[in-house]
Amino acid sequence: MTGQSRIDRRGFLRNAGGAALGAAAAGSIAQLTPPSALAQEKFPARDINWIIYQAPGGSIDTTARIIQPYLEKQGVKTSLDYVLGAGGRVARTKLHTARPDGYVMMTESAPGAAIDEVIGRAGYKASEFIAIFGWSVVSWQLCVKKDSPIQTFQQFVDECHKRRVVVGTIGRSGSSHIQLAALQKELNLPFGMVHFEGSGKAYPAVMGGHVDAAISGPGSGSRMHESLHFLAITGEEREKALPDVPTLTELRFRVTPIDQIWYAMATPKVPEDRIATLSSAFAKAFEDKMLWEQMQKAGEYLKLLTRAQVEDMVAKQTEVIEKYKDVLG
């Protein structure tokens, strides 16, 4: 995130909250159809069920825990619900089939739902979920255990051509999987993959020598820097959480970056006024500088996204994913 973005975040948040409430005023009458109880009930009148699709300890879990008390200050109390399996597909299915009353939401790491849609293994489309608020756009890091004989990305490449190297993802058919697929395809690297449900399970496998390397987010990696060594960043720019780790581009390897977009999303057909309430609560929560400080201490650097921005980015990612459909089944 640029310095200017950080300076302007209050203006962004005011605009995001205002836009959300404006959308509610324009669309609430049309959206609030029977049952009439939804129109009359104060929202939220009870805890929101917040679905987390990766194991505790990873960045999706960590960021949700940091955000929770600030949302509660805005009148939105949440309880975390860990729904693991199939790279988030089990969790998305639960969200998709939930009652459309706004009492269930999920942290998404796009392009997860778009991948499910492209490979045809889910009964939903990415565009059917309703984006609430986004807070992060980050790339990936490739890591090995601290004392691994592989200490550079070039050594990783060389090792892949000598023997069977195994790399862990943080979810089958998830965005970490597709980024590794891009590495395999575009650099012609014949490594194998093992899939874990989040970095909380992938990192122990690396440190225990059960896999040679893993791909995961820079924030969770920074929290494990004493036990891990980082080979490269997949994005176009270095990550603030791991400022000393070079990008693949710097190392003269050209690979399509598949960035992660983190945002909260809701069940399809939730009334617009309820989406506006949640969006406004998130926007106001992110006005608190203490939240930003806690995120940075955890190695998570924020880039705030409106609903429209999230929807546009997800649509563009869906087009890129089509290139790797054959390796994600």
Where does each model-flagged region fall?
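A short C-terminal helix-loop "cap" of Rossmann-like NAD(P)-dependent dehydrogenase/epimerase domains
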Residues: 45, 71-75, 252-259, 292-294
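N-terminal secretory signal peptides
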Residues: 1-11, 16-36
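C-terminal lobe and pocket-closing loops
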Residues: 137, 219-287, 319
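Conserved functional loop/turn residues at catalytic and ligand-binding sites
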Residues: 11, 16, 20, 82, ...
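An extracytoplasmic/periplasmic, membrane-proximal ligand-sensing/linker region
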Residues: 45-47, 185, 272-329
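N-terminal (or domain-start) structured segment
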Residues: 38-128, 172-176, 188-215, 220-224, ...
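Hinge/capping helix and adjacent helix->loop/strand transition within the periplasmic-binding protein
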Residues: 94-103, 117-197, 201, 248, ...
